[in-house]
């Protein structure tokens, strides 16, 4: 299998709700907008997609919509399929594969704090259950557990279809160290604030929250960097500074969904508890920053 298979500019899709249910029409429309604006892959039902509060049926529906909408295009579907129970993660991975996803994104198990050996066995079981690419997802700030560089490299070398890692630890040194020890690894940025530093240090793509709103800019930044045109990539990165900052003023995806609502890209600003709408102060800050960007609605 070609491990260099799902890279480039990727969007961690929001999940729009309407009257308490997944707004399937809006979801498909948002994906079409990504396709039209140069994104290489969409990532349904990840952190940004509020996967933790979706039912399994809703989770599966979102994957099906993403696959169907991307059918016949060059845009790939990297489906969220993580869980802190290995048997459940395997089931989600199998569903994604059977329903046409091009690969899966699997988050480090959260809450139960497995050992590195436990993480190795968890991911090996997932990789052996499907024959599509698997991207590891390291986000210790949310999971309370970090997968080590050694474990990532061992999984990459032992499992043919584990092709890389989405790094959202904020630790650039770890990213550089990872590539120094295994340069074949596909390192993907999982934080918009450090997209440029990761890309300019050997990263092969981004999974972006900001690209829900500005897919064309994230696509341009990513591809300039991959083409080693770092001057243009840095220029776009600098232009995105204020929007990247405000989109994380509260827990993701609260700010990005608020921005999408303000831009008229979703009909209803709905979350599922325990997530809720932003404070009035932050709502105003998001609105103010939005005015500085050429986004529909402003």
Swiss-Prot record:
Main subcellular location of this protein, as a coarse class: cytoplasm
Task performed by this protein: Catalyzes the condensation of (S)-aspartate-beta-semialdehyde [(S)-ASA] and pyruvate to 4-hydroxy-tetrahydrodipicolinate (HTPA).
Swiss-Prot/TrEMBL catalytic activity: L-aspartate 4-semialdehyde + pyruvate = (2S,4S)-4-hydroxy-2,3,4,5-tetrahydrodipicolinate + H2O + H(+)
A biological process from GO: lysine biosynthetic process via diaminopimelate
Keywords for this protein: Amino-acid biosynthesis, Cytoplasm, Diaminopimelate biosynthesis, Lyase, Lysine biosynthesis, Schiff base
Pfam families: DHDPS
Source organism, top-level taxon: Bacteria
Origin species: Campylobacter jejuni subsp. jejuni serotype O:23/36 (strain 81-176)
Active site: 137 (proton donor/acceptor), 166 (schiff-base intermediate with substrate)
Gene Ontology molecular function: 4-hydroxy-tetrahydrodipicolinate synthase activity
Gene Ontology cellular component terms for the protein in this record: cytosol
Protein name, per record: 4-hydroxy-tetrahydrodipicolinate synthase
InterPro entries for this protein: Aldolase_TIM, DapA, DapA-like, Schiff_base-form_aldolases_AS, Schiff_base-form_aldolases_CS
Subcellular location(s) per record: Cytoplasm
Binding site for pyruvate: 48, 207
Family statement drawn from the similarity comment of this UniProt entry: Belongs to the DapA family.
Record-linked SMART domains: DHDPS (SM01130)
Residues the record marks as site: Part of a proton relay during catalysis: 47, 111
EC number in record: 4.3.3.7
Name of the gene: dapA
UniProt pathway: Amino-acid biosynthesis; L-lysine biosynthesis via DAP pathway; (S)-tetrahydrodipicolinate from L-aspartate: step 3/4
Subunit-structure text: Homotetramer; dimer of dimers.
């Amino acid at each position: 299998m070609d491990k260099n298979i799902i890279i480039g500019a990727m969007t961690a899709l929001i999940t729009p709700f309407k009257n308490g249910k997944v707004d399937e029409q809006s979801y498909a429309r948002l994906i079409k907008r990504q396709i039209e604006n140069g994104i290489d892959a969409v990532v349904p039902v990840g952190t940004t997609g509020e996967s933790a509060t979706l039912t399994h049926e809703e989770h599966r529906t979102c994957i099906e919509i993403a696959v169907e909408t991307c059918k016949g295009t060059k845009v790939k579907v990297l489906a969220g399929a993580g869980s802190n129970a290995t048997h459940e993660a395997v089931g989600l991975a199998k569903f994604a594969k059977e329903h046409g996803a091009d690969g899966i994104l699997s988050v480090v198990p959260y809450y139960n704090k497995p050992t590195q050996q436990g993480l190795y066995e968890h991911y090996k079981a997932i990789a052996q259950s499907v024959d599509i690419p698997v991207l590891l997802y390291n986000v210790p700030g949310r999971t309370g557990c970090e997968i080590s560089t050694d474990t990532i490299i061992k999984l990459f070398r032992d499992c043919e279809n584990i092709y890389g890692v989405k790094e959202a630890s904020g630790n650039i040194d770890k990213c550089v160290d990872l590539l120094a020890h295994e340069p074949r690894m596909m390192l993907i940025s999982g934080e918009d604030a450090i997209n440029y530093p990761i890309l300019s240090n050997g990263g092969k793509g981004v999974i972006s929250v900001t690209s829900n709103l500005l897919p064309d800019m994230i696509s341009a930044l990513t591809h300039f960097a991959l083409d080693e045109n770092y001057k243009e990539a840095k220029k776009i990165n600098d232009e995105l500074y204020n929007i990247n900052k405000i989109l994380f003023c509260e827990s993701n995806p609260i700010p990005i969904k608020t921005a999408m609502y303000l831009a008229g890209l979703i009909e209803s600003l709905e979350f599922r508890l325990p997530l809720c709408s932003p404070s009035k102060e932050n709502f105003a800050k998001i609105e103010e920053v939005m005015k500085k960007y050429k986004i529909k609605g402003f």
